[in-house]
Amino acid sequence: AAPVTYRSVGLATYLGLQNLYITFNGYNPMIDARMTSCSFKEAEAYSVCGRIPQGESRVLVVASAGNSARAFAKGCSSGRIPLLLCVPADNVEALWFDKPLSSCVKLIVTESGSDYFDAISLAEKVLHSRHFFDEGGAKNVARRDGMGTSFLSATTTIGRIPDYYFQAVGSGTGAVAAWEANLRLIEDGRYGNHKARLIVSQNAPFAPIYEAWQAGSRDIPHYDDYHARRDAAIIDAKVLSNRRPPYSFAGGLYDALKATNGDAVVATNAQARRAAKLFKELEGVDIYPAPAVALASLIKMVESGAIDKDACIMLNITGSGEESITANKDLWYLKPSKVFSLTADIDDVVCSVEELFTK
């Protein structure tokens, strides 16, 4: 399913904004939004899967804090593509589905108390086996192009490139995808020749991108294991807890923010919860903590006078509608096939995961 962009009335009136456009990634039949995974990761999952060569015999590996796992599981199950998900044990409640998945989808987890980075580390151990391959993350053009559909949806609906782009980020790949889509639209020539200002937001206290940007640094500050796991446990938006985002390398988030005169901001759990409540009251549907962080950041900037009330603003609601799609339904949860300690030996991991797909 595709993102749906519409001009806000309720939220826009509340904030005093003349041109607020919401790009909705999720489930809301009232606006014909049909992403049953309730996440914008659904757009990237199908584009990544569509790019896998025919005859590929290896198993796709995806590390996730939750929403990517749900989206890839849905896509790979429907396409019968062998998939191994690596997720922190404390995030498995995100792996709900409206129907059982194909047995080609398997889940392994890192022990309780671990975070997204630990899931990535586990995936790296799996990839020592020649029977598995990595989906590629931010470096996979299919992933960026999939997420870039949100920006394309907004621009083609509005009829012009927006002035501002708001999104909460963990890796920042979605914002990079928006920047790349923006550049292509400039080349197209029908929607303007300017770059939307990227305003990315993080959920405090887990905010390595914010800290690096505010320090004027291209490098993400060191985040030791203890404090990273502690902060990841504190924040509501678990999907934003990436310790090592693709920020520094050429063409990454730092370059995207620089090129667009962008900014990085933060929102607390309390601010995000208020924003989520406001969105449901004014726009009529629930949103996840991550887009609530983005909305909270927009509210802060509007209230501080940092944004012209006449500006054309795109708010990327990256996940929404779980309450609607799960109401009065018996859900099916993907259960872990194996729990690994943080110190699991590479050979043990490889042996275990190979057995999962040979049984």
Where are these regions (language model features)?
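PLP-dependent amino-acid enzyme catalytic core
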Residues: 1-359
